[in-house]
């Protein structure tokens, strides 16, 4: 299993727009083969920090996800709403 944590530091006046556009991404992604879970989470202490937490069956499923139309159209747009570059970490399950 592969887990991805993609943290975005969103401009204060763009948080709602980010969430609305992310909704399209989540709705399409959870239907993909190999997607175990995929959601957007908001930091309880700083509402401008929005984080996608994803679980994939394997690396192949994750790589296929990156070729989808919704990924290629939504992700670049979401990055324009960030006030600074985010953090992207990928993990493999050990135990």
Identify what each model region corresponds to:
Residues 2, 40-48, 76-95:
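Glycine-rich beta-strand-turn "strand-cap" elements at beta-sheet edges
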Residues 2-8, 39-66:
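Short, well-ordered beta-strand segments in beta-rich or mixed alpha/beta enzyme
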Residues 3-30:
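N-terminal first-folded block
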């Amino acid at each position: 299993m592969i887990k991805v944590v993609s943290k975005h530091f969103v401009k204060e006046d763009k948080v709602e727009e980010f969430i609305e556009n992310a909704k399209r991404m989540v709705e399409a992604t959870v239907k993909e083969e190999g997607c175990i879970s995929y959601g957007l989470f908001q930091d309880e202490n700083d509402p401008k920090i929005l984080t996608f937490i994803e679980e994939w069956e394997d690396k192949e499923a994750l790589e296929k996800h990156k070729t989808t139309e919704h990924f290629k159209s939504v992700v670049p747009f979401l990055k324009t709403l960030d006030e600074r570059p985010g953090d992207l970490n990928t993990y493999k399950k050990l135990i």
